[in-house]
Amino acid sequence: MGGGVSVELPKRDPPPGVPTDEMLLNVDKMHDVIAPAKLLEYVHIGPLAKDKEDKVKKRYPEFRLVNTGPGGLSALLRQSYNGTAPNCCRTFNRTHYWKKDGKISDKYEEGAVLESCWPDVHDTGKCDVDLFDWCQGDTFDRNICHQWIGSAFNRSNRTVEGQQSLINLYNKMQTLCSKDASVPICESFLHHLRAHNTEDSKEMIDYILRQQSADFKQKYMRCSYPTRDKLEESLKYAEPRECWDPECSNANVNFLLTRNYNNLGLCNIVRCNTSVNNLQMDKTSSLRLSCGLSNSDKFSTVPVNRAKVVQHNIKHSFDLKLHLISLLSLLVIWILIVAI
C-alpha cells in the first residue's frame, strides 16, 4: 500500500474588512438628517463610542439611543417632540430649532440641543391657545395671524381633541369680536367667515356685528345703519341703496351685515363724467343721471375692444370693386372732354 501525499498550501492573511455604509456614518455630521425624523422612526448613526453616548443623548433628548450591532453600531429612535408653542406656532415654516443658552437658531452650533415641532402643528389645534393670545398683543405678525385664522376653517384633523380645540377657538373669537370687531384678529376672523360662505358663518357675522357699540356702528357701519334721511331718499330709486350710497361703496366689506353685502354684490356700478355749464334748480326740481344706460340697444356697459370694432366695421362695409371704379372714372373723364 502506498502512503498518502500531503501538500502544504501557502498561508495568506485574510483580506481587510470592508466597512458597510452604516459603519461609515458619523453622528456629528448628521444634524440635518436626524432632526426631521418622524415619531417612532429609527435613524442609524453608525459606530458610537461609550464616552460619546451621554453627549449624543443630551443633544437629542427627544430620541432614545438604541444598539443595532457589533462595534458600537447605534441608532436613534424618535419618542417625542419638545418644541414649545411660542417657538413653533408663530411661524408656518419651522419644523425644528436648536436651543443654546436660552436662544434658538435654525442652524446647529456646538452645545445646542434639538427641539422639534409637532408635524402639522397648526392643523391639530395645538397652536390655538398661544396664537389667540399672541395675536392680540403688540408684537404679533399680522400675516401669521391671518393665515392661522384662515387655516382654522380648513383643518383636516378630525380627532376629538382637534374638534374641541376648534369649537373653543370659535367661542373665544365670537366673545372677543362681539366687544370690538376692529381688532385686527377679529377683522381677519370676519373676512374668513365671509369666505367660508355658509348659513352658520353668515349668522355668526351678523351676530358679532349687531353686538358692536353705537360708536363702532357710527364709524364703520353707516351702510348697515343708515340715517332716516338716507332711508327716505332710497324710496325714490328702484335699485338697492347699496348701489348708490357712498357709505356702502366706500365701506369696509368686513363690517357689512350679510344683507348689505349681498345687495352690494348685485350692483353694476358705472362711472361716468358729466359736464354742466349752468344749472338752476329749486325745491320742486329733480335731477337724475343714468349715463345713457337705460337703452340697452344703444349703449353697452362692456368695455370697448378697439380691434373687434375695426374688424366689425370692415366685415359690414360694402365690397370695393376696383374694376368698376376704373370704368366710372374713364366715363367721367370722357363726359368732361365732350362737354368742353
UniProtKB/Swiss-Prot annotation:
Subunit record text: Interacts with OPG143. Component of the entry fusion complex (EFC) composed of OPG053, OPG076, OPG086, OPG094, OPG095, OPG099, OPG107, OPG143, OPG104, OPG147 and OPG155. Except for OPG095 and OPG053, each of the EFC proteins is required for assembly or stability of the complex.
GO cellular component: membrane; viral envelope; virion membrane
Lipidated residues (N-myristoyl glycine): G2
Region span, Disordered: 1-20
InterPro entries: Pox_virus_G9/A16
Cystine pairings recorded for this chain: none
Family statement: Belongs to the orthopoxvirus OPG086 family.
Organism this protein belongs to: Vaccinia virus (strain Tian Tan) (VACV)
Main location class: virion
Membrane protein topology class: Single-pass type II membrane protein
Induction, per UniProt: Expressed in the late phase of the viral replicative cycle.
Subcellular locations according to the entry: Virion membrane
Keywords, sorted A to Z: Fusion of virus membrane with host cell membrane, Fusion of virus membrane with host membrane, Late protein, Lipoprotein, Membrane, Myristate, Signal-anchor, Transmembrane, Transmembrane helix, Viral envelope protein, Viral penetration into host cytoplasm, Virion, Virus entry into host cell
Residue ranges of the TM segments: 320-340
GO terms classed as biological process: fusion of virus membrane with host plasma membrane; symbiont entry into host cell
Function of the molecule: Component of the entry fusion complex (EFC), which consists of 11 proteins. During cell infection, this complex mediates entry of the virion core into the host cytoplasm by a two-step mechanism consisting of lipid mixing of the viral and cellular membranes and subsequent pore formation.
Post-translational modification: Unglycosylated because produced in viral factories instead of the classic ER -Golgi route.
Virion surface side: 2-319
The name this protein goes by in its record: Entry-fusion complex protein OPG094
Top-level division of the source organism's lineage: Viruses
